[in-house]
Amino acid sequence: MALLELQNLKKYFATQKAVDDISLHVEQGQIFGLLGPNGAGKTTLIRMITGIFYPDEGSILFDGKKFDPIKDVGKIGYMPEERGLYKKMKIGEQAMYLAQLKGLSHSEAQSKIKKWFARFEMDSWWNKKVEDLSKGMGQKLQFVTTVLHEPKLIILDEPFSGLDPVNSNLIKDEIFNLSRNGATIIFS
């Protein structure tokens, strides 16, 4: 069964057509790539899938039902290309804040963050500020905060940007693990 189904999506900005009649099915547990040149509409399409934008025409089905951005947003993990981390905030506090925004209790969030931080060798980072991280370290933090609430759909926009080969492999391995455990993953 398709976790995500897009039917004839169109999006305009004034007279500019950003997305033109896109239809696709992404199955549960599938890893799916959105490919296209700059300006092809990939980011606009992602923003419609996440409920940031609404399509002007067409429909989005999520888990067999009409997509409801309010109800379904907690089932989606989105790591945008432009990172949204608060530079002055401590890493542990930021991860807790983002986890609780996604509906995790304090104790549940703390437990999951500790597990992911250990897995990514970030245990000692808890009290560091985001502004003190390299681009690759920030990328690891952003990945962790995207997946720690165990979303059904994970959307990753350039997830390997700024990572060295070792950390690229670590993220890649985790993406495959998440897929094997049933998460659906979309790359752009």
Feature names for model-found ranges:
Residues N169-N181:
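Helical segment within the ABC ATPase nucleotide-binding domain
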Residues G58-G74:
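Conserved ABC transporter NBD signature motif
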Residues I154-E158:
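Catalytic Walker B motif of ABC-type/P-loop ATPase nucleotide-binding domains
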